[in-house]
Amino acid sequence: MTGKLLLLATFFACMFLLSFRGERKKKVLFFGDSITQMGVDKGGYIDLIKTDLAQRGLSGQYEIMGAGIGGNKIYDLFLRMDKDVLSQNPDIVFIWVGVNDVWHKSSMGTGTDYDKFGKFYDAVVKKMQAQGIKVIVVTPAVIGERVDYSNAQDGDLNLYSNWIRKYAAENQIGLVDLRKSFHEYSLAHNPNNLEQGILTYDRVHLNEKGNALVASEMWKAMQ
């Protein structure tokens, strides 16, 4: 009798633990620069994702976090990922970086050379994967919204975005191709070839429509 009671107690304890485990929220973290830093503000793309989850009745299934810092480049992400990402034990991490790696070459004389960008990027991804994190990579969107590729940094943005696309394919990891999504949107909504005001308010940072587009694309990859 004692043995049966012990067996029953063990069974119910296991069921309780499994039930508790099943209710654990999936942690999703967005890792990046000022665009992601602003994404947590009201109306930002991360805030919109949270709102959408609530409307879908899915808030209990996800914990959404932002870890963006203005001006960050890929090596900044490498240096702070232990503190700002790995310590949070996320299930999914979106890596959205590259604009400052390109932009700061001309604006500040810094930036990140193409070969170093790839090495740091791979190191960031590999370290996250070693902790069992699902990594989704994101191409840098725009530095200027002209649709004819006449923006000053379009050449480098295309180069770095192509590297990210190839890296994602070779390593079989998720990709959100915002470079492509933004260009396709601008082709349809920027007939006057404007430099800003379509999806950004200053050529880089997102306006209302930009945040909505990014939230939609990120959500697709989360599912």
Question: Where on the chain are the PLM-derived regions?
Answer:
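A generic, residue-level signal for flexible/boundary positions that often mark functional hotspots
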Residues: F12, L29, E63, G71, ...
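Alpha-helical cap/lid subdomain in secreted, periplasmic
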Residues: E23, K50-G60, D76-Q223
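Bacterial Sec-dependent signal peptides at the C-terminal "C-region" and cleavage site
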Residues: M1-L5, A9-K25
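Serine-esterase "nucleophile elbow" of acetyl-processing enzymes
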Residues: L17-G70, Y75, R80-N89
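Short linear motifs at secondary-structure transitions and domain/linker junctions
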Residues: K4, V40-G44, G68-G71, T110-G111, ...
